Amino acid sequence: KSDTIRETKYVYDTKNRLVSYTDPEGRTETYTYDCNSNLTKTVDKNGNTLKNTYDNKNRLTERTAKEKKTGKETVHTYRYNAYGDVAVQDDTQFVYGDVSGQVTKETTKLTKNKDVVKNYTYDSNGNKSTFSVKAGEDTKLSLSYEYDGSSRLISVKDSEGNQAVSYTYDTEGSLSERQAANGLKTTYGYDYQNRLTSMTNETGKGVVSKYSSTYLKN
């Protein structure tokens, strides 16, 4: 009987950039970079490729994924505003708040005469306070968010003020309970290091699922 040595191999170029990775099964991934060290091409273990194109400010402008097996290509394009934020991604336009710098509006072209518009507002702490989705003139979703004094989310309500989800926290600030409008309640347990040790999902009819974990003591 002989033991087979299984090894993982990493190869770097003269600029200490990873150019190839070979797993213990002998499958290799390769990585290519431009003169500014931007990752321009990745070929994974299955021969699928991912190509990136950048502008003169090293911002990603196009990403093309190609499946080796089917030859299918998926292309994503990006344009930026004067502040360096993504202004257009594929068919979606983004508008940002002057002060917060957070996205306040997303507009996606659904059909020639119909857009899907998502609107966001934020409170003085930068927490999302409202979110709505419209398709054409129809409002599909409208939610409001409430936070406690520590900016922790405590409730989500619909447009009629009905509570969709509520959240409760323990004395350490960790999420201890999540209650959904459909009756599903999730409770969370933690150890002395505040690591998640249990999660239980239950309804009025009883426990639906349970999760538990233990950790080795340091």
What are these regions (language model features)?
Residues 1-23, 27-44, 48-158, 163-179, ...:
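Beta-strand elements of repeat-based all-beta scaffolds
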